[in-house]
Swiss-Prot record:
One of its GO terms (cellular component) is cytosol. Beta-D-fructose 6-phosphate binds at R81, R105, T133, R139, K175, R196, Y200. InterPro entries: 6Pfruct_kin, 6Phosfructo_kin, His_Pase_superF_clade-1, His_PPase_superfam, P-loop_NTPase, PG/BPGM_mutase_AS. This is 6-phosphofructo-2-kinase/fructose-2,6-bisphosphatase 2. Beta-D-fructose 2,6-bisphosphate binds at R259, N266, G272, Y340, R354, K358, Y369, Q395, R399. The record marks R259, N266, H394 as: Transition state stabilizer.
């Protein structure tokens, strides 16, 4: 019996049991914060005074959630306010006793929430980030009622900062260039914005974890990550949000991304494998060493994969480096160590399907870009925690990492240009990432394949609806990683692995490898069925002449 249904022992023999009042209150509280449905959309509500990094956190969190495949969108209340009030004059608009302005601000919030609802119901969004101050309990209660009416989950993120240096830096870096202050000098902007903050302080009611807000789900981030307070995390995605927010920081740093030096397989046009560096690849490694020495980067960490070409590149630097298996190149499965021409000849269906939707396509016995993103999530977390880092990796891995920092979607990610012997210098800034490309003037082959522009036949099964490869696997082991391309996406109709056999009727064409493999699979299946049917017939005859023993019962079952 659960603790919420415990009865008093003195009434246990009575026919009318009454639960303790304390247990009823505890049960009521549990229901008050539990979600309506496990998979309900989540509304993230930012809280905090101006210049506390709310928009920074909103955009960074949205970028991360979209990168891991959770559709997320920011709804910034300032954008709605500027639409309603075309010209901003002064901080007087934010005074709590300015009734007309208060009505406008509330109406803007309601319009934004309706857009949140439309995003969830019409655009299949999963998470919306409501980026506003939301400093009063009245405003937060209004948001909670809206969420309750629509069965949305709510998770609050409060940013608290009392460090004057951090606040001043935020104002100078972001607010001076705000659309609220066109053509104003810096001193006037600082003065007006500080007065705006004072207007909010008058009515600011922080989250109260001990009393008023103890049943809400939230995280308090204090002084840009010095301390955290987490309360009543409801589900998996909220725990992911908490984990991410506890890893990010705002200290200045630089991240360098580059591929290994040109390899022997690069020269041959082969993908995957574990070949060593070519002569030009070794020249790049020496040029990279010289570049790093000239930069004089403080406390630089160097990470590589566990493949030979990245290790050889790092060895030439003469510094300590760490090997990460999760930085290995995408697993091409049965296509490892093949050229694209060979893949097209041996596995034409696979080649066409990969061109159709490259992000979701999974190599037979290998990985997709979607798999690779999931594999690289710990790397992103560590990059967010660290200072200066150089990552020496591979083309597909580098694309995934760049897509995170540059906020690129699944359509763009597999086609990002990451040439050999080029360094990407990433410097996180207020609302994004500054990117510089550095060429070390060492020639290399071009391994990039542009996105195909040809139209695909309508009869071909889309990648996202295709559960399994038509291509036989390279080994007889049938226990393989399932090739489901999207969570919850099931085929519209059953997909037969023997579809290629239909082409044989009425046509004298040589069988492809796909057809041969499918024919062999059919032959084995028929033999197995014949054996099973024959076995059942023998058992039926024996059963008529003798009483079945335990052994035969077991066999028959």
């Amino acid at each position: 019996m659960s603790e919420n249904s415990t009865f008093s022992t003195e009434d246990s023999s009575s026919s009318s049991y009454k639960p303790h009042a304390s247990n009823l209150r505890r049960a009521g509280k549990k229901c008050s914060w539990a979600s309506y449905m496990t998979n309900s959309p989540t509304l993230i509500v930012m809280i905090g005074l101006p210049a506390r990094g709310k928009t920074y956190v909103s955009k960074k969190l949205t970028r991360y959630l979209n990168w891991i495949g959770v559709p997320t969108k920011v709804f910034n209340l300032g954008v709605y306010r500027r639409e309603a009030v075309k010209s901003y004059k002064s901080y007087d608009f934010f005074r709590h006793d300015n009734e007309e302005a208060m009505k406008i601000r509330k109406q803007c919030a309601l319009v934004a929430l309706e857009d949140v609802k439309a995003y969830f119901t019409e655009e299949s969004g999963q998470i919306a980030v409501f980026d506003a101050t939301n400093t009063t309990r009245e405003r937060r209660d209004m948001i909670l009622n809206f969420a309750k009416q629509n069965a949305f989950k709510v998770f609050f993120v409060e940013s608290v900062c009392d460090d004057p240096d951090v606040i001043a830096a935020n104002i100078l870096e972001v607010k001076v260039s705000s659309p609220d202050y066109p053509e104003r000098n810096r001193e006037n902007v600082m003065e007006d914005f500080l007065k705006r903050i004072e207007c909010y302080k008058v009515t600011y009611q922080p989250l109260d974890p001990d009393n008023y807000d103890k049943d809400l789900s939230f995280i308090k981030v204090m002084n840009v990550g010095q301390r955290f307070l987490v309360n009543r995390v409801q589900d998996y995605i909220q725990s992911k949000i908490v984990y991410y927010l506890m890893n990010i920081h705002v200290h200045p740093r630089t991240i360098y991304l580059c591929r290994h030096g040109e390899s022997e397989f690069n020269l041959l046009g082969k993908i995957g494998g574990d070949s060593g560096l070519s002569l030009r690849g070794k020249q790049f490694a020496q040029a990279l060493k010289k570049f790093l020495e000239e930069q004089e980067i403080q406390d630089l960490k160097v990470w590589t994969s566990q493949l030979k070409r990245t290790i050889q590149t790092a060895e030439s630097l003469g510094v300590t480096y760490e090997q990460w298996k999760i930085l290995n190149e995408i697993d091409a499965g049965v296509c490892e160590e093949m050229t694209y021409s060979e893949i097209e000849q041996r596995y034409p269906e696979e080649f066409a399907l990969r061109d159709q939707e490259k992000y979701l396509y999974r190599y037979p016995g290998g990985e997709s870009y979607q798999d690779l993103v999931q594999r690289l999530e710990p790397v992103i977390m560590e990059l967010e925690r660290q200072g200066n880092v150089l990552v020496i990796s591979h083309q597909a891995v580098m694309r995934c990492l760049l897509a995170y920092f540059l906020d690129k979607g699944a359509d763009e990610l597999p086609y990002l240009r990451c040439p050999l012997h080029i360094i990407f210098k990433l410097t996180p800034v207020a609302y994004g990432c500054k990117v510089e490309t550095i060429t070390l003037n060492v020639e290399a082959v071009d391994t990039h394949r542009d996105k195909p522009t040809h139209n695909f036949p309508k009869s071909q099964t889309p990648v996202r609806m295709r559960r399994n490869s038509f291509t036989p696997l390279s080994s007889s082991n049938t226990i393989r990683r399932p090739r489901n391309y999207s969570v919850g996406s099931r085929p519209l109709k059953p997909l037969s692995p023997l579809r290629a056999l239909d082409m044989q009727e009425g046509a004298d064409q040589p069988k492809t490898q796909v057809q041969q493999g499918s024919a062999q699979a059919t032959e084995h299946l028929q033999k197995a069925l014949e054996f099973a049917n024959g076995h059942r017939e023998v058992e039926n005859v024996l059963a008529k002449h003798r009483r079945p023993s335990m052994a035969s019962l077991t066999l028959l079952s």
